[in-house]
């Protein structure tokens, strides 16, 4: 959790795992989370499958769990970034001027994947993404 201290907003792309995780994150900053395929218990019913977040006056983010479920053209829809999860494979990619970001997984190690999260700093309207390795 130390890596998230000082965050203005926390976005979670699903596979939260428990209501306690959300509670702990909300102690650090406001949280917007979507439901992942492992979020099947009653606490997760309030989570939507996708969210739109205005990160600042110029940057609107689209958050979903599975990138395969993306059913819109992000640039045409006015999104600066698409935040997604599911694979737990951290990735930063730019497509047609839109940031595609998978923060990976900050929870228990999955398979042989690294334990990571991502931060996006917005400076003068420019998105500056970074993958942070926790282990």
Language model segments and positions:
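Active-site environment of divalent metal-dependent phosphoester hydrolases
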Residues: 17-21, 38-44, 68-73, 83-94, ...
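Short, structured coil segments at secondary-structure junctions
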Residues: 27-29, 78, 96
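Active-site neighborhood of phospho(di)ester-bond hydrolases with catalytic His/Asp-centered motifs
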Residues: 9-15, 32-36, 62-65, 81-86, ...
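Glycine/small-residue-rich loop that forms an oxyanion/phosphate-binding "nest" at active or ligand-binding sites
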Residues: 32, 38, 47-63, 67-82
């Amino acid at each position: 959790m130390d890596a998230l201290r000082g965050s203005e907003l926390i976005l979670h792309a699903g596979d939260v795992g428990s209501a306690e995780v959300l509670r702990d994150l909300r102690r650090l900053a406001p949280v917007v989370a979507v439901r992942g395929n492992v979020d099947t218990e009653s606490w997760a019913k309030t989570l939507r499958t996708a969210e739109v977040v205005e990160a600042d006056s110029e940057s609107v983010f689209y958050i979903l769990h599975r990138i395969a479920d993306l059913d819109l053209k992000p640039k045409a829809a006015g999104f600066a970034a698409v935040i997604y999860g599911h694979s737990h494979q951290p990735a930063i990619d730019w497509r047609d001027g839109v940031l595609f970001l998978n923060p990976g997984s900050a929870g228990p190690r999955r398979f042989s994947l690294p334990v990571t999260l991502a931060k996006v700093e917005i400076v003068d309207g420019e998105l500056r993404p970074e993958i942070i390795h926790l282990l």
